[in-house]
Amino acid sequence: MAPPVDTEHASPIHELETRAHALAARMPSLLVAARRVSHTVAHGIHGRRRRGPGETFWQFRHFESGDSADTVDWRRSASSDHLYVREREWEAAHTVWMWVDQSLSMAFRSHLSASPKADRAIVLALAMSELLVLGGERVGLIGGRPRTGRMATNQVALGLARRALNASDEDASLPPTSPLGAFSEVVLFSDFLEPLEQLTPRLEHLAVQGVRGHLVQVLDPAEESLPYTGRTEFTASETGERMIAGRAESLREKYHARMVAHREALMDELRRLKWSLLVHHTDRPPEEPLLTLHARLAGLEHDYRYRPPAEGLDDDIAPAGAA
C-alpha cells in the first residue's frame, strides 16, 4: 500500500539503505517515546501476583551487564570467582522474544496518520519491553540474547537499529527462524500483508518449538479504508511496481474485500496454532494496544503466562478489539 508518488522514484534497495540510516538516527527519540508510553500504561496496571509453588524453586546464572546489584546472591558468589544472580525457576524459564518488521512497506504513512508504521511498531516493541522488564521478565529480539534489568530495552533498541542497517529487505519482511526455548512467548510486530504462503511456514516454525505467539498487526488507517479518489498512482513499497488508477474510489470495494479475506485467513491459521492477533491503527494512541497485549500476556492468573482461549471463544484473535 502506498500513496501517490513522484515520477522520480529511488530504487527499493536505495530506499531501504536510506531509511535504515534514518531509523538509526531516530532510535534515541523513539526510545524516549516508548518509555513515556510504557510509564503511562504501567500506571493503569495493577501489581502482579507472584504466588504458587514456582516461588520456592531457584536457579543461578552469571551476573550480566544491566543486572542490578540487588539481584546478586552474595552467599553463592562468595565461593566462586564469578558473581551469581538468583532467579525463581519459573521466571528464568519465561522469556518474551520480539520481532519487528523493518521492511520497506512499514515506512508507509498516509495523510490520516502522524506516524509511519515502522516507527509505531518500534515504539510498541520498546514500550512492551519496558513493561516486561518492570515485571521481572527476560526480553530479547529473536536471534539475540534475552536480558533482564534496566539495560534490556536499550539492548533491544540497539539490536533493532543494527538489523535495520544490515538486513536485506527480504529478510526484514518475515520473522526469522532462530531457535527459541520452550515455555517462552513471542510477540511479532508487522503489517502482516505478506502472502500467507510465505508467512505461515515461519509462524509454524516458531510454534513447533513450544512457544506461544502474539501478532500485533500495525496498519495505517488508509490501508483499511483506501480513501483516495480520482486519478491516483500507487507504488509497491518493496518492488517499486506502479499502478495508475483512473478512479481510485472504484477500487475500494474489491480492495476492502481482499483485505478482509487476507485477515480472516491469517486468523484461521492463528486459531490452529492457538496464537493471538491484535490489530492496531497508527492514528490511535499506542497505549491502547499495549494494555490489550499486556492483558493477553498476563493470562487468567496475572502471572504473564499465556492462557489459550476457552474452546469456542476467539476473542484473543478477533480484530474486533482493534486499537
Label every PLM stretch briefly.
Residues 1-49, 57, 62-67, 76, ...:
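Exposed, interaction-prone extracellular/peripheral surfaces
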Residues 73:
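Short, Gly/Ser/Thr-enriched beta-strand-loop segments that form substrate-interacting elements
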Residues 70:
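Conserved AdoMet
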